[in-house]
Amino acid sequence: MSHLRLADLLEEGQRRVEGLDAMDRDQGRLKESPRFRRAWGVAATHMGLGRTGLSDSAEVTLRLEETGYFHLFIGCPDTGQGSDTSMCQIAAQELGVPFYLVRVTSADTLLTRDAGTSTATRVTYIAGSAVQQAASKLRTSLLSAAKEKEGIEHNALLPDLGWLANLAAFCRDHERELEALGNFAAPSAALDDQGQGDAYGAYTFGVQFSRVRVDSWTWKVDVERIVTCFDVGRAINPLLLAGQVEGGVAMALGYGLMEELLLQDGVVINPNFDRYLLPTAADVPPITQVILESEDPEGPFGAKGIGEPSAIPGAASIANAVSAAMDVEIGEIPITPERLSALVVARNRRD
């Protein structure tokens, strides 16, 4: 379980919000106008990692090849999120060798074991734990073989291709292990008939602050700034993590302001991107990211996950900001100009 509270994330985010407002005010970006209304909104989230209340495990293999390179075989597909890179980093860190010495084969049913799907924000936490275990086993085995081969105790594997290739040849000739299996099952308990139980072994917590500017003539909503704060356990790869958060923020912006599947008599009437609108780079505002690290006792090196949590609070934080700016309650998304106009008209009639 996370060592951080949502309050920690909210407090850190609030500090960033105040700093950004002060900077924008000094630079003349917050000029008041009767036409435009601004406000911040915030929303928080927590998401369990893995398959809810079900068995969730991963098996991987790690091998020292005769070339001196290590080869990781993992079933989880890298669909662009960079998990192949993160898994190699975990293996390299546990082995104590440079990252470039680890190669990876992923999602090849002929060669890889079942490590589960790349869903449910589970790859880093569950598959990564299996990778760490495999690397630990292989490292121990290889250090023992190195002692037998050279007659001296080694505290670490030498990061040298020639030395590792010679060690691999020795292991082959003396029938020593060149491969290790890692497996990890997320701690959880099946849900009872009331739907209660320990559904997840770990949770990712996060908050998003969004500043909007609403045009009271056209009812168009522009998001001017976003601040995100997430507790991801230990950040294995901060650059990939930042990319995941930016992608989640952009998805949530589209979800909150423009994306809507329209049906008429069971037929989709906006099947093309001329009517099903998506955010572009011009729509995504500057994003200030804050990563507060803790250490999960089960995850690899204390890591958890960030994939889906990054997209969860965004639409709600934008809706809360619009609500604060226009003094209306947002109960439906996307927040189109037509819907916002109707809400303001209804409010004025009540008043």
PLM region spans:
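Extracellular/lumenal ectodomain signal focusing on beta-strand-rich modules
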Residues: 101, 211, 223-225, 260, ...
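Generic long, charged, amphipathic alpha-helical segments
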Residues: 100-106, 280-304
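Cofactor-centric catalytic regions
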Residues: 1-71, 75-94, 107-249, 261-280, ...
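Extended, non-catalytic structural segments that build the interaction scaffolds
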Residues: 72-79, 294-314
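C-terminal substrate/ligand-recognition segments
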Residues: 214, 259, 306-331
